[in-house]
């Protein structure tokens, strides 16, 4: 069984036991979170259901790898180098369930 969930403005294809990195969630480590925004669920056939719930455990609150931003204008001696590290939450999917 797999599901497509949406969190942080992005969509993720998940199944039970998968580990994903999402935008930062306000939750402590080892806390269980429920994701109610489920786009679709599939057991054998595709089912778009609005009453599905995905339960996940927060493994870690950390920062992602650094992204380098480099701006340059040729022949003008203009160079700017900047870096950014995004806050992320690492989740383990524990359960995908359909509520009635």
UniProtKB/Swiss-Prot annotation:
GO terms for cellular component: cytoplasm; ribonucleoprotein complex; ribosome. Keywords: Ribonucleoprotein, Ribosomal protein, RNA-binding, rRNA-binding. Pfam families: Ribosomal_L21p (PF00829). SUPFAM superfamilies: L21p-like (SSF141091). GO terms for biological process: translation. GO terms for molecular function: rRNA binding; structural constituent of ribosome. PROSITE patterns: RIBOSOMAL_L21. Disulfide bonds: none annotated. Part of the 50S ribosomal subunit. Contacts protein L20. This protein binds to 23S rRNA in the presence of protein L20. Belongs to the bacterial ribosomal protein bL21 family. This is Large ribosomal subunit protein bL21. It comes from Wolbachia pipientis subsp. Culex pipiens (strain wPip). The lineage of its organism: Bacteria, Pseudomonadati, Pseudomonadota, Alphaproteobacteria, Rickettsiales.
């Amino acid at each position: 069984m797999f599901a497509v969930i949406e969190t942080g403005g992005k969509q993720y294809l998940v199944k039970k036991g998968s580990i994903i990195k999402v935008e930062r969630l306000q939750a402590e480590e080892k806390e269980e979170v429920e994701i109610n925004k489920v786009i679709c669920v599939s057991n054998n056939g595709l089912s778009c259901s609005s009453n599905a719930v995905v339960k996940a455990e927060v493994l870690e609150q950390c920062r992602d790898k650094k992204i380098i931003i480099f701006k340059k204008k040729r022949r003008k001696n203009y160079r700017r180098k900047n870096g950014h590290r995004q806050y992320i939450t690492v989740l383990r999917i524990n359960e995908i369930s359909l509520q009635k």
